[in-house]
């Protein structure tokens, strides 16, 4: 192949990948209709109500409770589940900080159980080892859009009488054993932040098939009100976490696009994985048979630099030069974050601070992923089959020129 682009050679591709978000007349029509209605808040309009029903049904659930963002969705779910001071909640170390910080905001204790370095999801054996008499819930993250090992995690939860709350922020439209993500535990939370596969800029939702849990979520979402109570009658400590009608309007239109986009991402993700998995040291996220649909919020792989023949930092720079947008993801796992390493719980769990020392946490698989992971964003997977072949050719080109690549980084 030709010389590396970062050394003056031609790029593998010069065309951009699809922009994100994707929108059109449908979004504009709903937004203008909402604007002209004068019903901009959740209490007055019908867009959010419609979206809650549609999204819950699409994800195999009877109830959906929309909130202002995915972090709040996690916090509301934990409070609705009855998580209280110093309860322990098991979370993965390789995830966005909100999975654990929401536990802290609920006045509970996040306990880190390591991930499987092949799937990037919670390792059930690590979860089982982390359960104590204080444990009340497990939060598996469907990382990159691939459902966690829910059969094994559900068995642990059932045996120990624990709640199972899915963090499905990446998993809109994913499925496990033909069941939709979001319907696999007691509750699930989703995010509609700008980068997500379904977005309105900022937003979130809780899904469940448990009516009492749904009622509790709605009360916490709506200032502690209850259906039969007076307007200025408040039953629980909460806040106003209601999603607005403009966000609901965008989400309803975006939801119409989700099925086709998810099919495309899944097909392209599988094609790309099949093309690059034969390269030495390149390990795409392993896909168990139970993953019957992968939404691919991210296409993830692990790069063994010693086997591939070039360091990850050089590969990331070279891929970008070849026209392939990518990143290394998290720089360190959650126990290494200053929030947990230095501050533990700040003003929250003062009494627990003396027995918590996250500097001693051992999460070798998560730490390895922070050193080896390469991420491609979901919009890349909305391209064509030929676009996936371009990405594969870029990896092949880098492997062919691995020695020049390593030398260039040393200079």
Spans of features found by a protein language model:
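Phosphate-binding glycine-rich loop
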Residues: 41-88, 102-104, 111-114, 179
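Active-site PLP attachment segment
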Residues: 183-225, 245-248
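N-terminal "arm"/small-domain region of PLP-dependent enzymes with the aminotransferase-like
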Residues: 1-41, 376-377
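Conserved active-site segment immediately N-terminal to the catalytic lysine
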Residues: 166-200, 229-235
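Structural detector of well-ordered beta-strand residues that form the stable sheet scaffold
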Residues: 65, 90, 111, 164-165, ...
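PLP-dependent aminotransferase class I/II
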Residues: 50-53, 62, 125, 137-141, ...
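PLP-dependent aminotransferase-like
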Residues: 79-168, 175
């Amino acid at each position: 192949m030709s010389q590396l682009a970062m050394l003056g050679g031609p790029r593998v591709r010069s065309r951009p990948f699809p922009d994100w978000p994707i929108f059109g007349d449908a979004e504009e029509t709903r937004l203008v209709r909402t604007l002209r209605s004068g019903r901009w808040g959740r209490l007055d309009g019908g867009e959010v109500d419609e979206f809650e029903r549609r999204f819950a049904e699409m994800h195999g659930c009877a109830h959906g409770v929309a909130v202002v963002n995915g972090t709040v969705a996690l916090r509301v779910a934990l409070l609705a589940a009855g998580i209280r001071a110093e309860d322990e909640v098991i979370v993965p170390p390789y995830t966005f900080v909100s999975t654990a910080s929401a536990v802290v905001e609920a006045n509970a204790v996040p306990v880190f159980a390591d991930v499987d370095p092949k799937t990037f999801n919670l390792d059930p054996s690590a979860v089982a080892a982390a359960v104590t008499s204080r444990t009340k819930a497990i939060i598996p993250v469907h990382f990159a859009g691939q459902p966690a090992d829910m059969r094994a995690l559900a068995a642990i939860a059932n045996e120990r009488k624990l709640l199972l709350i899915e963090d499905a922020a990446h998993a809109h439209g994913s499925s496990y054993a033909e069941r939709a993500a979001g319907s696999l535990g007691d509750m699930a939370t989703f995010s509609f932040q700008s980068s997500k596969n379904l977005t309105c800029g900022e937003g979130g939702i809780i899904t469940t098939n448990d009516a009492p849990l749904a009622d509790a979520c709605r009360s916490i979402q709506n200032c502690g009100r209850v259906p039969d109570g007076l307007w200025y009658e408040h039953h629980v400590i909460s806040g106003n976490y209601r999603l607005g009608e403009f966000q609901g309007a965008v989400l309803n239109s975006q939801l119409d696009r989700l099925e086709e986009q998810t099919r495309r991402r899944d097909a392209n993700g599988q094609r790309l994985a099949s093309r690059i998995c034969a390269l030495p040291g390149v390990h795409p996220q392993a896909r168990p048979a139970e993953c019957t649909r992968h939404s691919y919020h991210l296409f993830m792989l692990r790069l063994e630099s010693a086997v591939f023949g070039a360091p990850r930092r050089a590969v990331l720079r070279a891929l970008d030069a070849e026209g392939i947008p990518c990143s290394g993801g998290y720089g360190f796992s959650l126990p290494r974050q200053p929030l947990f390493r230095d501050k533990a719980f700040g003003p929250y769990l003062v009494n627990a601070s003396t027995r918590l020392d996250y500097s001693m946490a051992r999460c070798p698989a998560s730490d390895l992923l922070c050193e080896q992971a390469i991420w491609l964003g979901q919009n890349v997977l909305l391209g064509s089959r030929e676009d996936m072949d371009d990405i594969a050719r870029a990896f092949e080109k880098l492997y062919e020129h691995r020695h020049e690549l390593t030398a260039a980084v040393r200079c």
